[in-house]
From Swiss-Prot:
A Pfam family recorded for this sequence: ATP-synt_B
Keyword Cell cycle applies: no
Function recorded in the entry: F(1)F(0) ATP synthase produces ATP from ADP in the presence of a proton or sodium gradient. F-type ATPases consist of two structural domains, F(1) containing the extramembraneous catalytic core and F(0) containing the membrane proton channel, linked together by a central stalk and a peripheral stalk. During catalysis, ATP synthesis in the catalytic domain of F(1) is coupled via a rotary mechanism of the central stalk subunits to proton translocation. Component of the F(0) channel, it forms part of the peripheral stalk, linking F(1) to F(0).
Subcellular location: Plastid, Chloroplast thylakoid membrane
Gene field: atpF
Subunit architecture: F-type ATPases have 2 components, F(1) - the catalytic core - and F(0) - the membrane proton channel. F(1) has five subunits: alpha(3), beta(3), gamma(1), delta(1), epsilon(1). F(0) has four main subunits: a(1), b(1), b'(1) and c(10-14). The alpha and beta chains form an alternating ring which encloses part of the gamma chain. F(1) is attached to F(0) by a central stalk formed by the gamma and epsilon chains, while a peripheral stalk is formed by the delta, b and b' chains.
Family designation: Belongs to the ATPase B chain family.
PANTHER family the record matches: ATP SYNTHASE SUBUNIT B, CHLOROPLASTIC
Name recorded for this polypeptide: ATP synthase subunit b, chloroplastic
Additional notes on this entry: In plastids the F-type ATPase is also known as CF(1)CF(0).
Membrane topology: Single-pass membrane protein
GO cellular component: chloroplast thylakoid membrane; proton-transporting ATP synthase complex
UniProt source species: Draba nemorosa (Woodland whitlowgrass)
């Protein structure tokens, strides 16, 4: 390894007269040689450098273009999401309003139904009371009539003879049958 390093050191110290070698002393180098080397580097390196810079520029432009496309898609997706959100909020508001309306409607229906039921119960109660009053009145009439009839029969039995008694009974039975037909 040392021999290899020494050989490079010796290349830098070759004599300059009549031979070709590397001059590592920059201050001693001829400006014309430097300008030729720089010219060759610039001439050939310019194309390579331009290609590298153009490739880099194209990659940067493509990245920017892709970023812009992604940004536009993201903006579009955001707008779509906002539109869906507005639509969902509107539908939620409609459901809420419809729900409140439905609750109020059901409440009114329940109140009306309860009112009708109470009214029917009141009518049934009044009909039952009237029916019971009529039944009681008819029972009282029948008892009064029976008592009057028994009293009349008792009076007739004590005051009349058998023959008169039988004719009076037949007349009363006929009147009773007529009265019964009238009351029915």
């Amino acid at each position: 390894m040392k021999n290899l390093t020494d050989s490079f050191v010796y290349l830098g110290h070759w004599p300059s007269a009549g031979s070709f070698g590397f001059n590592t002393d920059i201050l001693a180098t001829n400006p014309i040689n430097l300008s030729v080397v720089f010219g060759v580097l610039i001439f050939f390196g310019k194309g390579v450098l331009n290609d590298l810079l153009d490739n880099r520029k194209q990659r940067i432009l493509n990245t920017i273009r892709n970023s812009e496309e992604l940004r536009e898609r993201a903006i579009q997706q955001l707008e779509n999401a906002r539109a869906r959100l507005r639509k969902v909020e509107t539908e939620a508001d409609q459901f809420r309003v419809n729900g409140y309306s439905e609750i109020e409607r059901e409440k009114l229906n329940l109140i009306n139904s309860t009112y009708r039921t109470l009214k029917q119960l009141e009518n049934y109660k009044n009909e039952t009371i009237l029916f019971e009053q009529q039944r009681t009145i008819n029972q009282v009439r029948e008892r009064v009539f029976q008592q009057a009839l028994q009293g009349a029969i008792g009076t007739l039995n004590s005051c009349l003879s058998n023959e008169l008694h039988l004719s009076t009974i037949n007349a009363n039975i006929g009147m009773f049958g007529t009265m019964k037909e009238i009351t029915d």
